[in-house]
């Protein structure tokens, strides 16, 4: 059996690069190896927010918030998923909400100092209709999934094309 796989050739290099930049590896099921000790990470099933990381960051950024404020913010984000606004309400929560902060964007230094960064592989994402998918790599800030990366072996044109079509279908928005 070859010591090289799709994981070792295309998934691990960007994952290791993100970890070298300060991203903390997290796992939905938990993972303990010679190199990684990741406890099981809880996530909100509707938003895929990593609840423990989100709550910790929320109270760091909003120290005078009430005890249930982080949970209320997750509920607010859940409700915003029903909007056909292309994520505008969520954008406003991150960038324009001056009362409660969920990500510190006040300056580049504060961004790195006051936020936490996580990365996961093969994290199941989906919606209430059961449309689930597992991106190769998901990137989080303060437990909030903000980006995902799909990786393919070089010269895998059929795989790249198939993934492109899946994304077009999955992320279509009403006109």
Where are the regions that the model predicts?
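An alpha-helical interface "stripe"
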Residues: 1-175
